[in-house]
Amino acid sequence: DLGTQRSEYDGQEKHQRKIMLGWELHGKDDEGNELVTERGDPLAIFKNYTLSWSEKANLRIDLQNWRNKPFTDAEMRRFDIQTILGAWCMLTVIPRPGKNGKMYSNVKGVAPVPSVIKSAGLPPAINPNQVFRIAEPDYELFETFGKGLKAMIEESPEWQALQGRKAAPKPVKAPSSGFDDMEDD
């Protein structure tokens, strides 16, 4: 949960509720190098989303691709984002230049793991699944975040209200489940 974040689109300022999803990467890159840190831990990659379930929302599109089927209206109403914790997927990652000119790896697509790969066996996850909610912050988890992520959360009106600085906006209600059948897809 990143709280409500200010962004600009087509010259207009917007304030939208944002979330971040992260994935632990397993496997090798295009050159055959293991996807690990210098310590040998799996690399991780993250993608920020607007918390929106509209038909064109990137969050909904990626989740539907991950499930390999669209959500019904009923599934969308009861979808709980936490049901994806620990669910395996395949990612399409592309290089993209940042505003500072540096190249970054961005998640372009999410897909289910093909059954032939599942049947061969998936590696065990190394890092624990974690959820951070501004409404009920885990301060120990918050302290593990990098400076940039902390600053982003701290600038949200929800965090400001929690710290007694400003009034929080009305909360955006997220629907609940739809990944209950993730293992079967």
Task: Locate the predicted segments by residue.
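Short beta-rich binding modules
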Residues: 1-185
